[in-house]
């Protein structure tokens, strides 16, 4: 590490002391035509207003404006940090107070995801209502963790079968993943009455070669990619407009999905849209003729995984009141509990090492 300003350093060949010279680089102030800065500020205002069709569901950050200028061929092209500075000077950006975050638990099993359609995250938002109506509506959201492509649909009931129909339809269009990650809602997992009996959604996943993965209970932030998208949907969609009819709601949901996939240029995708990024990727598609209602979903093989925190007692709760003693020495550590459906066995992993096994019938 370099010495700090004025730090005394001993020469190895002498007892003399000297001060390490400090090299200063001259900062070159970048200047851009006023019309470019005005274009940036106007783009921000129009994106926030969302009145123009092209900006209705647009992102408003400095990176998004940078990619827009790049697409327009603006020269000289200011970097995103300069655009951010201009927006801050104009009062368009409010400083957020940083939240004190706890250091991540090193035992949490992070699933490897280095290409498109390895992990999809699934979530359900709602209920919400139309103006003057008591009918409940839900928004089901699916997103690819790596490629950021999304699928959205409005549901009128919080039930498993419409969710399965949505998944099959989505995977026919965007390809099926290796893993589907979701929370522990009954609409995803199944009944508490028979905790070791797989729900229909998990059975359809296994039938299609997709491994269901359930995140820890009461830790929705573990589905980070979709939670980020949910915040965007709340701001751009649910809070920004009032829906008069169900037809209007469904139409705008489709428009939002299209906008996310075809206009949102993301730094994580090197400035590409999700559609552009995944266009040349070979996908595992689901046959257009696939009908889960006519399939035999009893004779299955595959794995269902649960990420669980070992409590002080040394136990984990897999589903409902189905508890397993792992050992007190593992308290406050996360384990990956994997059900081998064919072998009817539950295997517990910590740091990818098998530490316990249980019969699971």
List each language-model region with its residue ranges:
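Double-stranded DNA-binding cores of transcription factors and transposases
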Residues: 1-12
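Mobile genetic element proteins and their domesticated derivatives, centered on retroelements
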Residues: 40, 65, 83, 123, ...
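C-terminal, beta-rich DNA-binding module of retroviral/retroelements integrases
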Residues: 261-361
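Basic, flexible linker segments flanking DNA-binding modules
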Residues: 14-122, 127, 199, 276-282
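Charged alpha-helix within mobile-element recombinases
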Residues: 194, 201-291
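Acidic/histidine-rich, metal-coordinating catalytic segments
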Residues: 158, 171-194, 216-218, 223, ...
